Structures are given as C-alpha cells and as structure tokens.
Amino acid sequence: MLNIRPDEISNVIRQQIDKYEQEIQVANIGTVLQVGDGIARVYGLDEVMAGELLEFEDQTIGIALNLESDNVGVVLMGEGRNILEGSSVKATGKIAQIPVGDAFLGRVVDPLARPIDAKGLPNSSGTRLIESYAPGIIGRQSVCEPLQTGITAIDSMIPIGRGQRELIIGDRQTGKTAVALDTIINQKGQDVVCIYVAIGQKASSVAQVVSTLQDESALDYTIVVASNADDPATLQYIAPYTGAALAEYFMYKGKATLVVYDDLTKQAQAYRQMSLLLRRPPGREAYPGDVFYLHSRLLERAAKLNSELGGGSMTALPIIETQAGDVSAYIPTNVISITDGQIFLSGDLFNSGIRPAINVGISVSRVGSAAQIKAMKQVAGKLKLELAQFAELEAFSQFASDLDKATQNQLSRGQRLREILKQAQNSPIPVEEQTAIIYTGINGYLDDINLSQVQEFIEALREDLRNSKPEFGESIRTTKKLSAEAEELLKQSIEDVKQAFSV
C-alpha cells in the first residue's frame, strides 16, 4: 500500500482550488410573444439597445427597432418561418455591421455584404457599422473637382462634383438607371470606386445591370449591393446604408467613390411597411414621421473630405421614381431638399426621341461651375441660355405663322443644339470631345448643316480630332483650358469635316 502524505494531499487540493475559475455567462434573453409579416414582438429583453441585433432559436437575425414599455418590436432579416410563439430570443450586444475590404470590388453582395455571385467569400480587412456618423463640418471641404458623367447635357449644364449629392428623378422607364450606369462606365481609368445599390428591384434587372458593367469592363472597380423585390423589407431598408458603409471604407482611405441608390422610393416604401406593422403613427401618405431622417442621414454621409482626413470623397446619385411627373409628392420633395441639385428626366421628352430625356429647365446643380474644368466653363455658359430661349420661341412659334429671319435662325440654331445633346446609351463622351461638340454648336458652325446630318457631322468631327489632331485633346486634358492654339486646331478640324460634308 502506498504511503500518502497528508501535506501532499493538501497541496494538490490547494493547486486545484487555485486553478478553478468560475465562468459566468450573462445573456439577455427574451420570449417571442407574436410573430408574422416580418415582425416579431418580444417580451423580457430589458437591456436591449435601439438597433441591436437579436438572434432567434432558428438562427434568424432581427433588429430591435421599437423599444416599448412592455415589449420590443423586432424586424426580421430573414423568412423567420421556424420562429414560434414562446421561443427564446437572445440579444447579441452588437449593432448591425458588415465586413469591408478591397476584395469586394467586382462582387455582387446582399445587404449584409454576403456574396450572391457564387464566387466564394471575399477576404475582408475589417468591419464597419452599417449606420455611422457623417463627417462633421470641419472634416469637409467644398466640392471643387468634377466627376465627369460622360453625358454632354449633364457635364455642360448640370455639372456634378466629387462629394456632391445629385438626385436623378423621373417617371418609370425614362432612363434614370441608364444615366447612373453611364456615369459608372465613364469612371474607367479615373481611379473612382463605384457602388451600385439595387433596392427592391427584379432579379432580372439586377442581372442585366451586372452584365452591362461586365461588358463595358466596369465591374472591376464596382461593387453591386442587391436587395431584390422578394427580399424582406428589412433588407431593402438597410441596403443603402450597406452601400454607404462600403463606400466609406474607400473614402477614408483617400479614394474617390461614387454611390448610386436605385431607388430610394422603394426604400421609403419598405420603411413605411415596417413602421406600419410596428404600429408607429402614420403621417403624410402613410409614411412615418421620421422618413425625412431616413434619407437625410444616408445622404449626409456623402462628402469631400479635407486633406487631413485623406481628401477622399463620396458622391451620391440617389434615384427617385415619380408618379405622372409629380415632383411635389412627399418623398420627391424630401430628397430634393436634401440633395445639391436634381436631374429631371421627362417622359414626354423620352417619348419624342430626345435621349437622355433631361429637362434642362427644371434640372439644376447647386454646386454649379465649381465642378467644371475651365474649358467647359468657357463654352457651356451660353448653352443653357440659348436652349431656354429656344424652348420659349418654339412654344411661341406654334401659334405664329410668319416669323422674321432672326427668329427663324434662332429656332434653327436651337434645334441643332438639342440634336448635339442626344446620346446613345453606354457611350459616354470624354470631356475634351464634349467641349468641341458644344463649341461647334454655340458658335454657329452647324447652322448650315442639315438637321438630319448633325449627329453624323459630330461623329466625323470627334473622329477627326482623335485621329488627325490628338494634340487638341491632350492640350485640354493637361491644361484644363481651351487655349488659343487648341481653338485654332478645333476650327481647322471643323473646316476639314465641313469640306468632306459639302462634297
């Protein structure tokens, strides 16, 4: 029999006591009272935060939106079909956040940044809160750099700058998405990260957008965030904030970013649905009282940062769909008041063959010529005035039978100016060629060209400048001005093309 010494036993017991650690896990757990329509009412979550993520027994995640005295209103981020009344709910202690990183470029993700393009998980370099504070006044600088859209009508008369928020508004099927996609395609080689957020759209429409971006080699610098029409309202509601969070990751690294929200009308409708189901008091058009804050806190995140914060920028292009051209409805007026200008697309112009169907009279950019290069300022100043006078004269000429020569000339010039602003989809024009086109129009070089040949003439002029006089484009790209030498080259090119046309 072994000799067991009492002091050894006491040592072993003492060691075991020293090693013993009591782990207490405190969890905030509640009980489901009611579930249905993407909403759950939960009892017992006393210490839950507003916007906190909650986990149900079937691993469905929800967001605590309504904190009431006796229960919590939770919106579900999934189907939630296996959630039963009486089942438990656990508070996670986290606010909604997403992974971010350079590996997300070229990918299609859902509003929780999970890939939906069957290419595997991207490597994330960190996480960002979906809802984060907008930069303060001191952290910003005024918009001073242009963000070229490649659309002549916009870059000349409604210029967009880096860090600006420009609303694209119009009825359905007037080319709103086309304007946004052209802008993304035009950023090729400009070192701009683009994010396209599709909210409540058909999966086929999103697939078409992705296919277009791929064909134009624009997907390499673009992230697509898609929440389809059959996704829960919660995902449609958070999709724009996810897009903004992904853009902020690049913005705070000093990069220029462009975010397209297509469209915020559907986000407002999803938020209205959630609010009504949570029994929040309805206001105008049954939207909740904080629907203005829904959009303002999103669009205020767009900014041009000062040099101390890296000088990055986030440009926002929110899209709003109107009903029968009514821009005085609740959501359109809200977003118009938040943004720095709007591009109004008209159904009548679209149907009469003027595409992009931009109504120059109602459209405006509140940043103005600060977002233009000097060459464009030199030629575009007269364009808006000439078009406005032409629109007035055209309306008047429908009643008058005999017009004097000066009026006829002005009408003829206006028709040609309108013609040069027409542009095919997915074919953005570089700024130096836009300058040449507008110069040709406002200085009367097209007055003796047949109206049906104007587009052909413009194409020939662009080709001549590219092939025979490349120094013209080089001069504008480097100096940003239309110098006397460049103007001489342009006049020479116009004469050469005119001779070819008159033969």
UniProtKB/Swiss-Prot annotation:
Primary site of residence: plastid
Catalytic reaction annotation: ATP + H2O + 4 H(+)(in) = ADP + phosphate + 5 H(+)(out)
Location relative to the cell: Plastid, Chloroplast thylakoid membrane
Binding-site list for ATP: 170-177
Site (Required for activity): 363
Keywords from the UniProt entry: ATP synthesis, ATP-binding, CF(1), Chloroplast, Hydrogen ion transport, Ion transport, Membrane, Nucleotide-binding, Plastid, Thylakoid, Translocase, Transport
Function recorded in the entry: Produces ATP from ADP in the presence of a proton gradient across the membrane. The alpha chain is a regulatory subunit.
Protein's name according to its UniProt entry: ATP synthase subunit alpha, chloroplastic
Annotated organism of origin: Gracilaria tenuistipitata var. liui (Red alga)
